[in-house]
Amino acid sequence: MKNTTAMADYELRHIEALRKNLAGCTVLLKKDGNFPLEKPCALAAYGSGVRRTIRGGTGSGEVNSRYSVTIEEGLQQAGFTLTGMEWHTGYEQARKKAHKAFLKQLKKDAKAVNQNFILYGMGKAMPEPEYNLPLNAEGDAAIYVVSRISGEGNDRTPLKGDIRLTDSEVRDILALDKKFTRFMLVLNVGGVVDLTPVMGVRNILLLSQLGVETGGALADILLGKANPSGKLTTTWAAFEEYPEMPDFEDMNETRYREGIYVGYRYFDTFRKQALFPFGYGLSYTEFRLGAVAVEANGAQITVRTSVENIGALAGRQVVQVYLSKPAGKLDAPWQELCAFAKTRELAPGETESVTCSFTLPEMAAYDTETASYILEAGNYIVRVGVSSVETAPAAVLHLDKTVTTLQANNVLGSTDFTDLTAPAATMERPAGVPVIEIDPAAIACETVAYDRIEEVLPEVDALTKEDAALLLIGDFDPNAKGFASMIGTAGRHVCGAAGESCDKISGFPFLIMADGPAGLRLAKEYYEDDKGKHAVGSTAMPASLQEMLSGPMKLVMSLMGGSGKPKPGCEIKTQYCTAIPIGTALAQSFDLAFVEQCGDIVGEEMERFGVHLWLAPALNIHRSIRCGRNFEYYSEDPLVSGKMAAAMTRGVQAHKGCGTTIKHYAANNKEYNRTRNNSIVSERAMREIYLKGFGICVREAQPKAVMTSYNLLNGTHTAESRGLIMDILRAEFGYEGIVMTDWVSPITGDARSAHRDSQAQYVAAAGGDLFMPGNKGDYDNLLQGIDSGAVTLEQVKINASRVVRMARALTQE
């Protein structure tokens, strides 16, 4: 609950900036004209999300903010009289019983596979329970709020209570829609839920998970103070309609057999039926697109149109431009998003001119046979509209011969299968649209210098082998074991931080890192004594972890994390951070300016609390709706993902001494056994889908750091892949920052795995700069690698020089 009298000025400013933009992150999926409401009224409020509102997912995505407004609180603050509150008393009883059984089974399952209960249960969400409670409340309108949560460490399931609705939910939603003239189904979810059984409901709002003001945002929308203007960045469909992924649950190998046909690329090309397609979203008002003009200036394509608000309420619209490419040597999806733009808020009757642009080389396909990006000869159809299924052809770009846009190298290994390919089809040239000839000579072929030489700083060159190696390992306590080894020396200088680089060498600055991606996660309260900084109680511990622990275990974990009870008279200091919307919700806004503003909020709080690197944003692709961390990620589309990550990075890095860490590079699209699972992906799919967003972010915003993923790629750990790090990231994308690992620890892997964890010596040899969080074993491994020749001392010092340069740049030393 909000208590503004206790809040600092920065908190109030940040919350105000967020609140007025949150409706832009929500997606109105269905409407019948009965919303918005004219004024606050008696509202029958049902569903777990009314009182147990989810503001974001679990794991690294959790944020320790001062408060969070539930939907119940937000509606009451807005003046609604809520009815049906006795339903929630009954629901809590059913949930408590189910949760007790859930934890009991979780402990049993962990024991059966000889795993630590806490690590085994990380990210596992209890399915919604079944219940049988009366719906006897009256009111002028009604809502039912479906909530789902997921998180780091585990994936979702296609079961009732998770991806599917429970029988209880379906029964009550349909009953309420029948009983009330004004009924809204509200989805307080971070990922796709199969809505097949309730598609007859007249009003559906994807509220998503919007951070601290989630409840207030819904009140604004119901009352028409704010108008939903988001668009889906992931295709919503019945679970059976998505591509089959038979080895998604395989412990060791995950084969990306669908190739480039991910999300709408699959649905459009293979004529699959979506419930709600990519790019889709309604508004309380109506819009009309004007005439479309397409121009070509060499390889630069510019699309101009206008948007008119022809409805009765103010609102915003998103113009989307898609490109259908010719299928020749390479097959091609039916269409791919190539540009988008969002209008300002338009009053009824108001019109705005909109311009979108892209370059043809940005849309090139990767030919593995020639190791090059190519644009094949033929017709390129430009489609313009307001969703992936609501477009019209606007122009045909004709290229009379195939051109190469970039000559690369195949560096990612091979697969043991052939990618899914599109059925042979001839795309007819649409009638009545202009044909624009593209001069092949105007499309330059980019060359890449893969053998660039990097200098070693003289002061680093003068270091001993032992000291140079220290700079590549996250700061560690040589005596730490178990959980303590997993978190390194996190929080020594900033309480609740996720990790630090080495501070053991005089004259060399160090970096402080904090988790995200929905804001900074730091200890809310801490105190200092002669032994350092300590979190008060469990204020540094994620709420999802606290829920799983008994009282004694909470105490043990708090003490291990440096938490404790301050002595009388000790000053208690605070680090309240703002929880911004989850990544998927931000992307649904299609509002780059707002995403950059969110980055500005995070950057200001980083400056305030002394954090150099934010371990975010995360821009992995929504390959499967089962991925437990999809809420952190932006989209199934790499253009959206890259643009959003770049906007967030610009906002953060506008602040002195602050940088982002884009992650997880790459092909980290499931959580089960993530540290030792091998993603088997074709070079083409990697480059066109899973790496493309990273390239966009690097070229547009140059994040200070990149975090590799836990998984292997075609048999090699991503953190140990020189092709990924040096050839593609640095040489092709032009990356200038540092590369770190994800938080590797031997206690997080499943002992039954066929693959090992990544190792510091091989990470360094691949050009990785920081092995995180760091422990004595990692340091010894690196020294052994130097002695054995697995990594040269010169490479270690090159990597160390990059770390030192970045630390100096961010600490201003």
Residue ranges and their predicted role:
Residues M1-A365, I374-E390, Q407-E813:
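Glycoside hydrolase catalytic-domain context in secreted enzymes
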Residues A371:
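Extracellular/periplasmic metallocenter environments
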Residues E390-Q407:
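Short beta-strand elements
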